[in-house]
């Protein structure tokens, strides 16, 4: 089997049917991939919704398993442990794959047999509409990711996002999968950066990571949920994860990250002033707040 697609879910029962159906109706058919759905200790009716969906969508290889240890990294590793595919693909529970998603993944693998890791485009699907205060820079907090218009290698330390990334299973196993000290989402707590560290380990082995915009998912974003508290959790989680990751390297790496974040904070202030001068003041505060919250996460306990 070529591909194992792993979806990890925590209390997203209202989203999972759309995610699963988008894979069920792939143009490639269902023969060359499996789907492993990992319930990460949900307290809602995720299990029942999955079972109901599967009763009416009986073809293909779909497996439901549970991981009681809270955290996306734990759940992803559990899914990967039973994967039968030569490649493991990670997709979020609130993502919807485009019709040719699997077809384009397999084509990318066939066209570049030397690759070991790559990722694709993520397009936010705002419900009901993109808020006026949203900017390109802040949109990364809701999963917006469009690295290039054509397939290419990632450069300058860039890497795919966890919600649309593919890794050769043998290499994934070689580096030990996701670092559970960077668990991702644990209830309302976020400690991010798990995908970044994983790809940096692959790069350290001498490999290049690639991007292909034809490998695309839509990420559902309910605007009513984008409260200041939610945005703080996401942004501070990025900083918190970078603290864990860099301290694991050295104190010097952590200090350099602090300097980097201070420079980004300064750049955000300049960008906010630019938005005001351009007549879009609603975008100014969020872009500055993003860097403040990320810095709090980096400096916090």
Locate each region found by the language model.
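Short, well-formed alpha-helical segments that are part of the catalytic scaffolds
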Residues: 12-26
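A conserved acidic beta->alpha catalytic loop
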Residues: 22, 39-48, 95-96
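Conserved donor NDP-sugar-binding/catalytic core segment of glycosyltransferases
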Residues: 100-134
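A short, conserved alpha-helix in the catalytic core of glycosyltransferases
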Residues: 162-167, 171-175, 182-215
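Non-catalytic, C-terminal membrane-associated alpha-helical segments of glycosyltransferases
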Residues: 233-241, 247-301
């Amino acid at each position: 089997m070529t591909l194992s697609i792993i979806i990890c879910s925590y209390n997203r029962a209202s989203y999972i049917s759309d995610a699963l159906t988008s894979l069920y109706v792939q143009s490639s058919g269902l023969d060359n991939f499996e789907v492993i759905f990992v319930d990460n200790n949900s307290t809602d009716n995720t299990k029942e919704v999955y079972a109901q969906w599967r009763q009416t969508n009986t073809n293909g290889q779909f497996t439901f398993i549970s991981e009681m240890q809270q955290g996306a990294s734990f759940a992803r590793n559990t899914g990967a442990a039973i994967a039968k595919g030569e490649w493991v693909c990670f997709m979020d529970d609130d993502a919807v794959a485009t019709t040719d998603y699997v077809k384009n993944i397999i084509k990318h693998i066939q066209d570049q047999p030397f690759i070991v890791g790559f990722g694709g485009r993520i397009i936010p699907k705002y419900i009901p509409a993109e808020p006026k205060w949203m900017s390109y820079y802040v949109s990364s907090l809701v999963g917006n990711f469009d690295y290039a218009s054509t397939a290419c290698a990632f450069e300058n330390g860039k890497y795919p996002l966890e919600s649309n990334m593919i890794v050769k299973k043998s290499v994934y196993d070689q580096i030990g999968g996701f670092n559970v000290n960077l668990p991702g989402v644990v209830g309302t707590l976020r400690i991010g950066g798990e995908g970044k560290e994983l790809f940096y380990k692959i790069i350290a082995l001498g490999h290049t990571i690639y991007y292909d915009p034809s490998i695309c998912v839509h990420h559902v974003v309910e605007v009513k949920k984008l409260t200041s508290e939610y945005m703080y959790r996401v942004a501070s989680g990025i900083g918190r994860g970078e603290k864990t990751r860099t301290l694991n390297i050295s104190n010097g790496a952590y200090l350099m990250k602090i300097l980097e974040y201070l420079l980004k904070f300064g750049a955000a202030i300049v960008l906010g002033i630019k938005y005001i001068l351009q007549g879009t003041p609603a975008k100014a505060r969020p872009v500055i707040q993003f860097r403040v919250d990320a810095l709090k996460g980096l400096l916090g306990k």
